[in-house]
Amino acid sequence: MISFIKGVLIEKDPTALLIDVNGIGYEVFVPMTTFYTLGDIDSQVSLYTHFVVREDAQQLYGFKSKVDKKVFQELIKVNGIGARTAIAILSGMDSKTLLHCIENKDYALLATVPGIGKKTAERLVVEIYDKLLKMANEIYAQTSGTTTTSQDSQAQQAPTSAVLANSIFNESVDALLALGYKQKDAEKMSRSAMGDATTAAEVIRKALQGSIRSKR
C-alpha cells in the first residue's frame, strides 16, 4: 500500500502528474482541487495517496490533504461511484462544499458531476451522510481558499496570444473530458470561462465553478 508520496514534480497535466521519487517515476491522478495547489515543474511535491488495484490496471490517486484522501475513500465505497467519478466530484467542489451538499441533500448540485444522475446522488447522500458528518470538524479545519501556484501568479503577466489562448482552451477541454464531461459541454464550459485567463488551470477552475453556480 502506498499511502504517501514525496518527490520532484516532473510532469504536470490536469488530473495527472508524474513524480520522480529517487529515480522512479510515479503517475499520480489528482482532483483539480489538488492540482491548483501544485508548484512549478521540478519543485518538490508531497501528496497523500490511495492505491487502487484492478484486473486491468494499478492506479495511484493523490490528494493535498489527509482529509481529502479520507473523503475520496468514503466516496468510492458508495455503490455506483468509482475512482474516476470520485475524482470528478472533488474536482468540481472541495470537501467543504461536498459536506454542505450532503447536509442539505442537494441532489441537483451533486447531479452536475459527470456520471452522477439523480438516483446516484440520492444514494450517495444516504450512504455517506453519517460518515461525512463525523468528519465535519476535520473538513472545516482545513485552510479555506486555494493556494496560489506560480502558474496562477503568471496570470498577471503579458497578454495572451492567439496561439497561447488556443492551447489553453484545448488543455481545458482535454481536462474536462478526462473528468467525464462530453465534448460539446467541455468546449462550451471552457469557452465561457476563457475571459482574460492566461493559464489552463484558471480556465478549468472557472469552468467547474461556473457549472456548479449555474445549477444553484
From Swiss-Prot:
SMART domains: HhH1 (SM00278). One of its GO terms (cellular component) is Holliday junction resolvase complex. Keywords: Cytoplasm, DNA damage, DNA recombination, DNA repair, DNA-binding. Residues 164-216 are annotated as: Domain III. Residues 144-163 are annotated as: Flexible linker. It holds the Pfam family RuvA_C. Residues 65-143 are annotated as: Domain II. One of its GO terms (biological process) is DNA repair. The keyword DNA repair applies. The keyword DNA-binding applies. GO terms for molecular function: ATP binding; four-way junction DNA binding; four-way junction helicase activity. It is found in: Cytoplasm. Residues 1-64 are annotated as: Domain I. Homotetramer. Forms an RuvA(8)-RuvB(12)-Holliday junction (HJ) complex. HJ DNA is sandwiched between 2 RuvA tetramers; dsDNA enters through RuvA and exits via RuvB. An RuvB hexamer assembles on each DNA strand where it exits the tetramer. Each RuvB hexamer is contacted by two RuvA subunits (via domain III) on 2 adjacent RuvB subunits; this complex drives branch migration. In the full resolvosome a probable DNA-RuvA(4)-RuvB(12)-RuvC(2) complex forms which resolves the HJ. Belongs to the RuvA family. Has three domains with a flexible linker between the domains II and III and assumes an 'L' shape. Domain III is highly mobile and contacts RuvB. The RuvA-RuvB-RuvC complex processes Holliday junction (HJ) DNA during genetic recombination and DNA repair, while the RuvA-RuvB complex plays an important role in the rescue of blocked DNA replication forks via replication fork reversal (RFR). RuvA specifically binds to HJ cruciform DNA, conferring on it an open structure. The RuvB hexamer acts as an ATP-dependent pump, pulling dsDNA into and through the RuvAB complex. HJ branch migration allows RuvC to scan DNA until it finds its consensus sequence, where it cleaves and resolves the cruciform DNA. This is Holliday junction branch migration complex subunit RuvA. The lineage of its organism: Bacteria, Pseudomonadati, Pseudomonadota, Gammaproteobacteria, Thiotrichales.
